[in-house]
A protein has these predicted regions:
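Acidic donor-binding loop of glycosyltransferase active sites
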Residues: 256-270, 283
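Short alpha-helical donor nucleotide-sugar binding micro-motif in glycosyltransferases
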Residues: 245-246, 254-258
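Conserved acidic donor-binding segment of nucleotide-sugar-dependent glycosyltransferases
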Residues: 299-300, 304-311, 320-326
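Conserved donor-binding/catalytic core segment of Leloir-type glycosyltransferases
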Residues: 4, 180-212, 221
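Nucleotide-activated donor-binding/catalytic signature segment of Leloir-type glycosyltransferases, i.e.
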Residues: 230-250
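A short, well-ordered alpha-helix in the C-terminal region of glycosyltransferases
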Residues: 327-341, 353
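Carbohydrate-associated surface elements
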Residues: 41, 148, 167
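Acidic anion/phosphate-binding donor-loop and adjacent secondary structure
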Residues: 151-154, 168-188, 231
């Protein structure tokens, strides 16, 4: 079976959607599916099996910025690649976001699965409701990564949408070599890790204030960058290490090494895949008590969840995990089991079955192993 997975966001940049598309494609290939990824790239494709439609531009979207490719050359390149690849199935991630995924859907000549990642409010769904509903009807099957993403898609686009949660490449995180422990005043080598874009909805300012309230025998590793980086670094307390953008390999190593992983987001998270990655790495999690995280980590079972936007509560949650080895061990044990239940292997098997059912419904031949 030939499948082309299309991502609207730059595959050269870190992001939840990009990571899911690339990880799913890798795992599908392990199952014998011919899986090609198509999307914007700002430079050479990040790995084999990826085809670029050209560079991206940053546009404001859903409280963040999105690296999209909207120009005529990207549209032309998308159509050229589809003509050359001759896929049996398209798997379009965020299929209504302008760019290669929407272009492929409008071309309308290949059975398509659409996966919706966004939660909250998407203004285009509201303003252009009749148009986006008409375009969404071109999808043969619809999936969403969380109940919140499904609710958004079904409310504004109509039609049924089944939840297939994001997956995690468990072995990649579980078997990573831990990053060296940092030097701390008391010699404990304890570290708190934050990973994410430096923008208001990620709550990094809340974490910095919480860290200010902790004792100094720990280091706060901050990975990522964004529009608020300069302002945050200027007011950060001592003990913060600003890592900038890190590679996938370093991410896995730092997750393995961290004493605790912290996700202080305020909103806009439809599914906390980074929480799963921390659990797979064997690291306890402290996170905001928001819907996208509650679907992944249950309170006091796989994570300590605290009210979002409250630095006092966040400091208390971090202190509990840092100071209570029994609690940390219990979170790690439960988190490891939880991460395994979201394995990318399981997700790939479910999507392979969906592709087959879509082909059967559309009357297309089953071409496994023939191309």
């Amino acid at each position: 079976m030939r499948v082309v997975l299309i991502c609207p966001y730059s595959l050269s940049l870190p992001g939840g959607v990009q990571g899911q598309v690339l990880g799913l494609a890798r795992t599908l290939r392990e199952r014998g599916v011919s899986a090609t990824v198509l999307g914007p790239c700002d430079g050479p494709p990040p790995e084999p099996g990826v085809i670029s439609v050209g560079p991206s531009v940053l546009l404001a979207a859903n409280g963040s910025v999105a690296p999209l490719a909207l120009d005529p050359p990207a549209i032309r390149r998308t159509l050229e690649v589809l003509a050359a690849e001759q896929p049996d199935v398209l798997h379009l991630h965020e299929p209504l976001v302008p760019g290669p995924a929407l272009t492929a859907l409008l071309a309308g000549n290949v059975p398509a699965v659409g996966t919706f990642h966004a939660s909250g409010r998407v203004p285009a769904y509201v303003w252009l409701r009749p148009a986006v509903r008409a375009v969404a009807r071109r999808l043969g099957l619809r999936t969403a990564v969380s109940p919140e993403a499904r609710a958004l898609a079904e409310r504004w686009l109509g039609g049924a949408c089944q939840v297939l949660p994001n997956g995690v490449e468990v072995e990649r995180f579980a078997k990573a070599d831990p990053w060296p422990a940092p030097a701390t005043p008391g010699g404990t080598g304890r570290s708190i890790l934050f990973v994410g874009r430096h923008e208001p909805r990620k709550g990094l300012d809340v974490l910095l204030e919480a860290f200010r309230r902790l004792d100094r025998d720990a280091v706060l590793w901050v990975a990522g960058e964004g529009p608020n980086t300069s302002a945050l670094t200027a007011t950060a307390p001592p003990g913060v290490e600003w890592l900038g953008r890190i590679s996938d390999r370093e991410l896995a190593q730092r997750l393995r090494a961290a004493t605790v992983f912290c996700a202080p987001s305020l909103h806009g998270e439809s599914f906390g895949v980074i929480l799963l990655e921390a659990m797979a790495a064997g690291t306890p999690v402290v996170a905001s008590d928001i819907s996208g995280y509650r679907d992944v980590a249950r309170r006091e079972k796989e994570a300590v969840l605290v009210p979002g936007g409250d630095p006092v509560a966040l400091a208390g949650g971090l202190r509990r995990v840092l100071d209570d080895a029994t609690l940390a061990g219990r979170l790690v044990e439960a988190g490891t089991v939880r991460a395994a239940s979201f394995s990318m292997e399981r997700l790939a098997a479910r999507y392979a079955a969906l592709y087959e059912s879509l082909l059967a419904r559309s009357g297309s031949p089953d071409v496994r192993g023939t191309r």
